[in-house]
Every structure is written in structure tokens, then in C-alpha cells.
């Protein structure tokens, strides 16, 4: 066996039989080709693969050269926040809805993976955001996101008053239902639904997108990817939260501030050589086809 990769992890949280079938097919296919395969514990239990070598996401990150995530973008986001801490490449097979991040078609995935495993792929380093809750000089609760960090009410939608500082310089104050702070990866997710700009994946920038601002002059703002964003609350509205990729929530207490910056970690996302980001946008967003 001649391959760029030797140890491969299979990742996902299957929700329907087709996804489970893809996990099982991939497991046997990789084994037949002589790869050392590590499967997430939960998947092996679902499939009753008692002979499989299993591990956690951290185990896969430490031991594997490549992680194959099967599922939708939500599965990829959950796995990527952990796998980004390790020296591992990640690719996705789409068994969800949109599939911006899990872009391999399950019907042709094995053929595409054959090329990828032979070293024919392109790599994209996608940066993460890091959000931390601080009180004065004491910082505590911390999380990361691939797509976005969102300031929002915890229970009932209502107006929030806050100030935004960029690199310790006051930028603007706002009355709105919240604020979306998105990476280029996340610019085609929640941020796009709120009217934010599309940023191509390797742009070194962060988008700040207001949610239902109480002024007609409030518009999305794109800033340098190396900037630090501070959210300050003059009078805290009860039940505020920061959510990361809509999967992890950090509650905000009175007197606390939020700091959001680019993480030190990057997701090493790979695609087949024929991957075209703009074709993906066109097919996922229903853009018009070429005229000539």
C-alpha cells in the first residue's frame, strides 16, 4: 500500500440508517486496503464492530493522519473544534443537508477518497475563533468555534445594549437582538442568514453582523482577522449568552465582558483536487448558472 496516510479515523454521530451504512462501508473498505483504522466508540457500538479499534476524538487526533467525518456540517463543527488541536487532516462525507464542510458525495465518496489517499488533494487551513468571559483581569469560561460566536439572549428574544471595541479602540455601540461574529468558514452559515457578507475561506478577516439592529444605519463590518473584539455591557440584560457554533453556550454574568479573538488552532480541511469553492456556493445557495 502506497499512501500519504497510514492511520485513519472515522468520525460522526449518525442519525439515520444511511449514515450508519456509510460508516460501515467505509470501515470495511479502508481495512481491505490495509489502513490502520480507528473508529469513534459510539459508531463501533452502533454497528456492533467488536473487532474495531476504537477511540475518542482526542485519541483519533493524537494517533491518526486523517479523520473522515461522516454526517452534516454540525457533525463536522463538533469534531473540528477538537481535531483542530492536533496535527491531523480532516475531510467530510455529506450525510446531512447543506454540506458546506462535508463536501464529498456519499455515492462517489470512495472513488474520491482513493485519489485523496494517494495524495491528490488540496488543503485549506481554516482558523477558529476563541471566546472568553472575563471580569476585570480575571478570565474564566472559554470556548472555540469554527463558524461563529453569537451574542444573544438566553431565553426570550429582546433588545441588548452593548459596546464593541476593536483592539482596545471603541468601534460602535448597538441596540439589537444580538451580534454574530463569524469566521470566513462561518460566513455562509448563520451570518449569511442575517445579511452578512460571504468571505472566501482563506481571507484573513472576521465579520461582525448585527441581529435585528434598532437603527437603519447599522451594517455588517469586516475587520482584520488578527483583531481582538471586546463586548462591554453598561447595564447587563438578564439571561445573556455567548454561543459557539450553536453547540456550546457560555452564560454572561453582571460585570463580565467578552473577548473574541482568532484561536491559535487551525482546522486542516482537505478536498479532492477538483473541488471548486464557487461551484459549491452555486449549488448550495442556488445561484444562477453561467450564461455562456
Curated annotation (Swiss-Prot):
GO terms for biological process: NAD metabolic process; NADP biosynthetic process. It is found in: Cytoplasm. NAD(+) binds at residues 73-74, 147-148, 158, 175, 177, 188-193, 247. This is NAD kinase. It is an enzyme of class 2 (transferase). Involved in the regulation of the intracellular balance of NAD and NADP, and is a key enzyme in the biosynthesis of NADP. Catalyzes specifically the phosphorylation on 2'-hydroxyl of the adenosine moiety of NAD to yield NADP. One of its GO terms (cellular component) is cytoplasm. It holds the Pfam family NAD_kinase. Belongs to the NAD kinase family. Signal peptide: none annotated. It comes from Sodalis glossinidius (strain morsitans). Keywords: ATP-binding, Cytoplasm, Kinase, NAD, NADP, Nucleotide-binding, Transferase. The active site is at 73 (proton acceptor). It catalyses: NAD(+) + ATP = ADP + NADP(+) + H(+). Its cofactor is a divalent metal cation. Its EC number is 2.7.1.23. Its main location: cytoplasm. GO terms for molecular function: ATP binding; metal ion binding; NAD binding; NAD+ kinase activity.
